[in-house]
Each structure stands twice: as C-alpha cells, then as structure tokens.
Amino acid sequence: MENTNEKRKEMTARQEEIYEYIKKYSKENHMPPTVREIGNHFDISSTNGVRSILAALIKKGYINRSPRLSRGIEILSDDKESSKEVASNTIEIPIVGRVAAGTPILAVQNLEGTVTIDRDFLACRSDVFALRVKGDSMINAGIFDGDLIFARQQKTADLGEIVVAQIDNEATVKYYHPSADHVELRPANPKYKPIIVNNRKDFSIAGRVIGVMRKVN
C-alpha cells in the first residue's frame, strides 16, 4: 500500500474536488470509487491523469492507495485519536466480486476492494466476506439488486438457509434444499424456477449469508 509520512500540505482546487468526491462516494456506497469512476465523474479521459492527482494526495498525506485493488483508495484522518477509536470499533470486510441473484454469472474471485463496517453489525469474524448482488431472484428474502451481502465461509449449510453456492465456477445466492440424489437451489421470487443440481461434483457451498447492506437513496 502506498503511503507517506510527510506532513499534510495544502491541496490545489482540483485535488480538493477529487478528495471530497472520494469521501462522499465512500460514505454513500460503503466503498471507495475506482480510478475510472473518478475520471468519468470529472470528465478526465486519461486514467493516468487521475492517478497523478491521487499520487499527489498520497504524497500530501490525505489518502492511501493499494494499486492492486480496483477499489484500493483509503481516506486518511488527520485526527490520530479519532482514527484509533474508529478503527477499534470497525472491521474491513473483503469484497470478493459480484454474485448473480437470478441467472448465475461467472464468479469473480479477485478482490474488488473492502467495505468497513461496525464490528457489532455482524458480530464479525475473520471468515466473513462480502459480495455484490446482481438480479432480483431473492427479493422476497429482502435481498435486492445492488445489495452487498455478507457471508460466513463454510462448506455446509442446513436445510432452508440462504447460501452462496458455486456451480461450474459460477456463483449464485439461493435457499439451500438438499435431498438424497440432488440439490435444489430455490429463489425467493416466483418469476424464477429453482436450480436443480444433479451432479454434486459441480456444486459447492462458498458460504452462508448472514447479513445484507443496502444503499438508500
């Protein structure tokens, strides 16, 4: 992670605009923007142009950035005591990709970034991960398109639990209903049919859903 020990220096007007945008975006979406999203918002056609501004903000002590993560920007607080207090009450959960709630899509296992939440929200442990939902097949379970779901990593589940299931390298969120000769993954929307898995070699459970976070407009 890029970092600096220099004291903070005054920002230019452009740097301040982008810094404030990053703070606002992160607060509203529970994750930082990507370099491309920043460029699109400010009509900066070159990603190198955005990166140069981010590099200046890093050097001046306003942000950190993990170049290997698409959402690797971190806002730095200038209040050390406040930062320590916040850090002790929060935990960063990895976002490992998007998951289909509807027609399954190819699971993206590369880290998209992290989301910071209150430790009490999920009684968090180190084995929790987050995924972004795409689709409306679980709306009657209170899981909507664009929601961020939280799942505890585990390879088994009880009948009727909501799981993140992987089928042939694809991932989907469904109710888990196993039987002797197959697994039925049931949606929570009458528009969709259950997914029947006959060959268990192509099926695995990645985790059990334990929470959901939604952006409220």
UniProtKB/Swiss-Prot annotation:
Q: Which GO terms describe its molecular function?
A: sequence-specific DNA binding; serine-type endopeptidase activity
Asked if DNA-binding is a keyword of the record, the answer is: yes
Family membership, please give it.
Answer: Belongs to the peptidase S24 family.
- The cysteines covalently paired via disulfide bonds are none
Q: Any idea what this protein is called?
A: LexA repressor
DNA-binding interval(s):
35-55
Instruction: Give the Enzyme Commission number.
Output: 3.4.21.88
Q: Where is the active site?
A: 137 (for autocatalytic cleavage activity), 174 (for autocatalytic cleavage activity)
Q: At what residues does the UniProt record annotate the site feature described as Cleavage?
A: 101-102
Keywords of this protein's UniProt record, alphabetized?
A: Autocatalytic cleavage, DNA damage, DNA repair, DNA replication, DNA-binding, Hydrolase, Repressor, SOS response, Transcription, Transcription regulation
Quick one: a GO biological-process term for this protein?
A: DNA replication
Protein source organism: Fibrobacter succinogenes (strain ATCC 19169 / S85)
According to UniProt, the reaction catalysed is:
Hydrolysis of Ala-|-Gly bond in repressor LexA
Q: Give Gene Ontology CC terms.
A: protein-DNA complex
Higher taxonomy: Bacteria, Pseudomonadati, Fibrobacterota, Fibrobacteria, Fibrobacterales
- Top-level EC class, please? hydrolase
Q: Which Pfam families match?
A: LexA_DNA_bind, Peptidase_S24
Task: Tell me the name of the encoding gene.
Answer: lexA
Function comment: Probably represses a number of genes involved in the response to DNA damage (SOS response), including itself, recA, uvrA, ruvAB and ssb. The probable consensus LexA box is 5'-TGCAC-N4-GTGCA-3'. In the presence of single-stranded DNA, RecA interacts with LexA causing an autocatalytic cleavage which disrupts the DNA-binding part of LexA, leading to derepression of the SOS regulon and eventually DNA repair.
Quote the subunit structure annotation.
Homodimer.
Q: Which NCBIfam families match?
A: lexA (TIGR00498)
